[in-house]
Amino acid sequence: MVSGTVGRGTALGAVLLALLAVPAQAGTAAAADLPAPDDTGLQAVLHTALSQGAPGAMVRVDDNGTIHQLSEGVADRATGRAITTTDRFRVGSVTKSFSAVVLLQLVDEGKLDLDASVNTYLPGLLPDDRITVRQVMSHRSGLYDYTNDMFAQTVPGFESVRNKVFSYQDLITLSLKHGVTNAPGAAYSYSNTNFVVAGMLIEKLTGHSVATEYQNRIFTPLNLTDTFYVHPDTVIPGTHANGYLTPDEAGGALVDSTEQTVSWAQSAGAVISSTQDLDTFFSALMSGQLMSAAQLAQMQQWTTVNSTQGYGLGLRRRDLSCGISVYGHTGTVQGYYTYAFASKDGKRSVTALANTSNNVNVLNTMARTLESAFCGKPTTAKLRSATSSATTVERHEDIAPGIARD
């Protein structure tokens, strides 16, 4: 173990690095074609994120049973408690991958057709019968993202909804006030509205809450003991990292945004988890443990986002500088940035978290954890490529994607 301290104001920061050897399963030796994770590079990313305004940051890499864990800074600015990789946090839009898994399991069970109209299952919900389940799950429905209105002003918008409880229909109504942004299937346009519809589909087809379906289909089978869906409760259970929202105004004081209902997101963004549980989840997903091979292939039918990113069905693909593609999701919710991705075979996974948001510099810096985790120590050429590709990271796409903040 390597440890040290980093000062940040009056709060104590901590750096942790641990390598834990865990017996690998038979026939699942670490993928030989992946370079070893670059722990020095990971630590540098966390240090940079703190210098850019994050109170704390952490990353956990599961390399086929060998665990790399690093953390720096604080979980709680008031007490100075150091952040650790066991702290729970709000995962934001990583929730979309959980919702997508449930829907694809329902396809496997013959209860859902990806190419059927959403209105087949939820009559009259959407203004166009041509909008399909597949288009909703791939952000090609044209449904306007209501969070653009909610969070046009970051802190006032958050304070106006932090204790509110919305119904799914409330959120759909907010979206439909604007009409659609494009014809069904015509374009990729990220919208939280799509995964509100996903939650409605889950509840209609199963007769259960999304909380029950997440628990029975994912949390319990994978033994995700740090993962919860507590909406509309405002408290994160157990030991957790506090979240700190950066105001739009330069130099404004960070706002403790830890406690909120997240009712504005629900099945689009209200899950709570940990680095270990998200690593476990995406490893299980990519190794085929959560659905049939046919549905996993459907999940990976990509729509182009930009030159280095694609979006499937509740799943992101990122193409890294070393030629490796990784699969998972990003998450932004007030006070938390999350990156959670795995290799194609699920044998290596990484989850990175900074406990701030509305800070584009931290957002783009934390994306570099993927390069260090999957591409290893950079050559000069890789370093130039990684630096260039960092500028293409989506900026605040997971929340209020239509609002420019930088």
Swiss-Prot record:
Q: Where in the cell is it found?
A: Secreted
Look up the signal peptide feature and give its range.
Answer: 1-31
Extract the InterPro entries matched here. Answer: Bact_CellWall_Synth/Modif, Beta-lactam-related, Beta-lactam/transpept-like
Q: Which segments carry the region annotation Disordered?
A: 387-406
Question: This protein's superkingdom?
Answer: Bacteria
Q: Name one GO biological process term.
A: peptidoglycan biosynthetic process
- Keywords carried by this UniProt record: Carboxypeptidase, Cell shape, Cell wall biogenesis/degradation, Hydrolase, Peptidoglycan synthesis, Protease, Secreted, Signal
Compositional bias, Basic and acidic residues, is annotated for 393-406
User: What residues form the catalytic site here?
Assistant: 93
Q: Per UniProt, where does substrate bind?
A: 151-154, 190-192, 316, 330-332, 357-358
- Which reactions does this protein catalyse? Preferential cleavage: (Ac)2-L-Lys-D-Ala-|-D-Ala. Also transpeptidation of peptidyl-alanyl moieties that are N-acyl substituents of D-alanine
Any one GO CC term of the record: extracellular region
Give the EC number(s) under which this enzyme is classified: 3.4.16.4
Per the record, the similarity remark reads: Belongs to the peptidase S12 family.
What the protein does comes down to: Catalyzes distinct carboxypeptidation and transpeptidation reactions during the last stages of wall peptidoglycan synthesis. Mistaking a beta-lactam antibiotic molecule for a normal substrate (i.e. a D-alanyl-D-alanine-terminated peptide), it becomes immobilized in the form of a long-lived, serine-ester-linked acyl enzyme and thus behave as penicillin-binding protein (PBP).
Q: Please state what the protein is called.
A: D-alanyl-D-alanine carboxypeptidase
